[in-house]
């Protein structure tokens, strides 16, 4: 039996203090939040800090913006163990990967290349922020928590905490999918639905 497996993913990354500080900077994943859903049921959530390799020392801007400490990241899991966990969450390699924006998968691919580790996912990749923009006809992409507010809801937990953002994205995903179904063109009625055959037969007799 085919199952509908979703991984709703949010990462937080290292940030530079300025354009050239540190030199040759590229973002690395330092926090991950994942919601795994099978057939519309949440079966697992995952949250962890991840130790960056190339730029292990967090910048002041990064710590201030993400409300994260150097100690939390230093005690996080190794990138190799993190990828192992991603593989465990998608053993059949058929999960649909859902993110808010395209940066999460871009950074994951770049980090995998830097660490000489194969990219862990093979399923469909869906950018929910782009789907939201197209669905509502917005000209620009909307932030995750602003989109939640536009739906008359509030985000889950704390913004820029990876698991809280993943849970918020999952809530939004379900709301958008629900609205898409409402707007789908209904199937044309059959002749039996258009005509009450019982009444027709009564009149004939």
From Swiss-Prot:
The keyword Cytoplasm does not apply. Pfam families: RNase_T. AMP binds at residues 12, 160. It comes from the Bacteria. Residues 6-173 form the Exonuclease domain. Binds 2 magnesium ions per subunit. Its cofactor is Mg(2+). Mg(2+) 2 binds at residues 10, 104. Mg(2+) 1 binds at residues 10, 12, 165. Keywords: Exonuclease, Hydrolase, Magnesium, Metal-binding, Nuclease, Sporulation. GO terms for biological process: sporulation resulting in formation of a cellular spore. This is Probable 3'-5' exonuclease KapD. It comes from Bacillus subtilis (strain 168).
């Amino acid at each position: 039996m085919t199952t509908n497996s979703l991984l709703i993913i949010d990462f937080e990354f290292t940030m530079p203090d300025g354009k050239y500080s540190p030199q040759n900077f590229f973002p690395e994943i330092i926090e991950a939040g994942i919601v795994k859903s099978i057939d519309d049921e949440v079966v697992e959530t995952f949250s962890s800090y991840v130790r960056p390799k190339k730029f292990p020392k967090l910048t002041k801007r990064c710590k201030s913006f993400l409300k994260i400490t150097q100690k939390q990241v230093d005690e996080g899991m190794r990138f190799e163990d993190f990828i192992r966990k991603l593989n465990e969450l998608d053993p059949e390699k058929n999960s649909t990967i859902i993110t808010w924006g395209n940066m999460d998968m871009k950074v994951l691919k770049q980090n995998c290349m830097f660490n000489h580790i194969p990219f862990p996912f093979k399923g469909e990749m869906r950018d929910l922020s782009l789907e939201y923009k197209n669905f509502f006809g917005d000209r620009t992409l909307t932030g995750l928590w602003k989109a939640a507010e536009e739906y008359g809801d509030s985000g889950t937990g704390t913004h820029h905490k990876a698991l809280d953002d993943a849970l918020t994205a999952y809530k939004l995903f379900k709301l958008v999918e629900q609205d898409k179904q409402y707007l789908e063109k209904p199937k044309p009625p059959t002749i039996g639905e258009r005509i009450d055959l019982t009444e027709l037969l009564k009149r004939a007799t």
